[in-house]
């Protein structure tokens, strides 16, 4: 409207008048472009800092010699660990996971249960003490060699943006299609896969977002079955599933445990670990109690209190 009067009076030509009218649009477009560029720059700097953080990490050390042991007993000897300096998660944790037995770990949230699995898989290095597999300390063994001996089924399942078949094949790249399908039958996922339009060639989407939580969990178990490692780590595999999927996953885990393996299982409900060969009860970063279900109930300690509380809730 400011330019309308001069234009109407003939003192402003039509081209200039149109340019003035369009000026706010140009300014808005420029402001939007600047905002997009600044956002891109901010994201670029975040990515740059993350990359530099990885590059500045100490180079991984350890022998690349295969980890060959007669047994797969796991021993923690006075192990300490902190994610943040000065805030210990594990404090002189000492225990043994017997070879080819099922050991369950229970305890309060944040007591260090998942940390134990991460240290066994060598996702992190212990800040003190010694972790051994088959009597051989893994402190100076490359993480890659340790992971060759380990299969892990975690709460948060990572899947590649690939087909179901190839996601499972990542566990053992030379596996045949028949071996993959056999593993899926054991993991209770063959039936739902075959119901899909493309079957085993169905894309999972980025990080498996085209599948439900229970389906992702069973595919992860199929990978563990296919890999057939001597050590199996299970981290609260049924923690966030509905009843139907939880039952299917529990059956898949039961099939997985048929083979003689050294198994360490974390569970949020005690009922699924009461038949374990050994139960470790975590408390304040240490092993507060250990024993079988019956032995721990007889002690009348932390485990017995947790069991009684769970029974009251389910009654």
Where are these regions (language model features)?
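ABC-type nucleotide-binding domain
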Residues: 69-315
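Pre-NBD coupling/linker segments of ABC/ABC-like ATPases
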Residues: 58-69, 296
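Conserved E/DxxT/N motif and adjacent residues on the DHp alpha2 helix
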Residues: 53, 60, 169
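Two-component histidine kinase transmitter core
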Residues: 57-58, 124
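Hydrophobic alpha-helical segments in the permease module
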Residues: 1, 14-36
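Cytosolic ends of transmembrane helices, especially the final helix of ABC transmembrane type-1 domains
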Residues: 26-54
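Juxtamembrane "helix exit" motif at the C-terminal ends of alpha-helical transmembrane segments
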Residues: 1-8
